[in-house]
Structure formats: C-alpha cells, structure tokens
Amino acid sequence: MYTKNLNSLEINEDYQYSRPIIKKPFRHITLTVPSSDIASFNEIFYLEPQYVAQALRLTNTFQAAIDPLTLNFDFEKALQIANGLPNAGITGTLNQSVIQQTIEISVMISQIKEIIRNVLGLVINSTNFWNSVLAAITNTFTNLEPQVDENWIVWRNLSATHTSYYYKILFSIQNEDTGAFMAVLPIAFEITVDVQKQQLLFITIRDSARYEVKMKALTVVQLLDSYNAPIIDVFNVHNYGLYQSNHPNHHILQNLNLNKIKG
C-alpha cells in the first residue's frame, strides 16, 4: 500500500466545455491504494480522475531512473526514459546546485518554488497546484520526523554536525493549462545541512542553517490517453482552451517535437 496526494478537478457536468473546470470547493484527497510496486517518489497528482491511470503509468516508468545501489535519481537515465516515451516531449530540465549558503528555511522554500516554476516550462495558473508545490517543498526540508522511514527519503551521511539525505518528489498535472497534455515533473533533491539528524527531524521554516542543495529535475509532457477523454475531445482536441493562440502555453506545446510511437 502507498499513499498518493490527489487534487481532484471537478468537471463541468453539462459538457458545454471540453476542458476541465475547477469548481469551488476544491477537493484535496489523500488516497491509499494497494500496489505491488515500491514508490520511490512522494507523488502529488493534480488531475481529473480518469487520467490517474496514465499518471501512475508515467510514475512507474520513472522508477527505473532510481539507482538500485544508491537509491538516488539517475538524471541521465531519466532523460533516456523521457526520450523513449510515446507522444511525449521534454519542456524543461535542471541538474545543478541551487543553494550553497546559510539561509532561513522559509526563504529557501520560496526560492525553490520559483526554480520549479522555471523548470516546469509551462505556465500553470492554478493557485491550488502551486499551494501543493509549496507544501511539498516545505515537507522536503521540514516535518521530517513523520517521514523518516518513507521510501522517498534516503538518509546518507550522518554525523554529529552534518546530515545528508535524498528526497524525491513527482508532480503530475493535467488541467485547462496543459490542455490535451499531461505534464510530469520528477524531482530529486540532494541535501546536506549543518545540523545533526535528530535536530533536523524537528526543524521549522523559521530556523536557519547552512544548506547545500542540488536539484535534478525534468518536465515531460505527454498527450492524454484518448480513450479516457470525453468523446468531444477525442475528435477535437482543439476545443481545449490551450489551443487559443493567446494562451501562454500554446506555442510551447504546438512546436514540441513529440516522440513517435515505435511500430
């Protein structure tokens, strides 16, 4: 069994629109499902229920990018996987150190949120999605005690003065901003902090410490599985708001070189 955080989009029931419409109140669902696979990512889905299977399939595909010896995220392997996905393309990548300083954790969280916004490579207007991103980043650096034994966190070098760990998140998003596509963003953090582990487990966003943070991430977009789409979408994906020429993601996805389906 493992847990998924699902942000469920509620759909316009009279189908006057073919794209997902978010209605208030917004529903955040934590779902625990049986699984024969070990999830190495903290998985956060923001999508319509009929696309959960596609998101799970993509998540499981990127499990192959986890090095079985170190349990770290193999960035080159992830690129190879992304380039082999059918009807998919890459909109952003990152593989570098992003923090090397003494910093208040709340400030670091805000900086990393903007880094994720950039590596996503798409304009996502949903406040709820970005609140989920902010919560996930916050849990990468704080609230660690309840997560201490989770598969997405790997404790490495521990000493009286330092702690190093890996933390892996995977976001899946599908809404009116992504149109006929789903975007998947696996992220791996390599974190070293000048704090002993037992203290780190209870660190808060108002605390400061010296951090070294490296991020490995890439964003893959894939065409939605047509058999899960409303009939109107199967025959006319241009009904999605994304295909309005003034939508900020229109040219990004329109000009994307999608991987071909191998025959």
Swiss-Prot record:
UniProt keywords, alphabetically: Sporulation, Toxin, Virulence
GO BP annotations, alphabetical order: sporulation resulting in formation of a cellular spore
Any one GO cellular component localisation term in the record: extracellular region
One GO MF term attached to the UniProt entry: toxin activity
Post-translational modification summary for this protein: Active after proteolytic processing.
One Pfam family recorded for the sequence: Bac_thur_toxin
Its biological purpose: Kills the larvae of dipteran insects by making pores in the epithelial cell membrane of the insect midgut.
Entry similarity comment: Belongs to the cyt1/cyt2 endotoxin family.
Protein name as annotated: Type-2Bb cytolytic delta-endotoxin
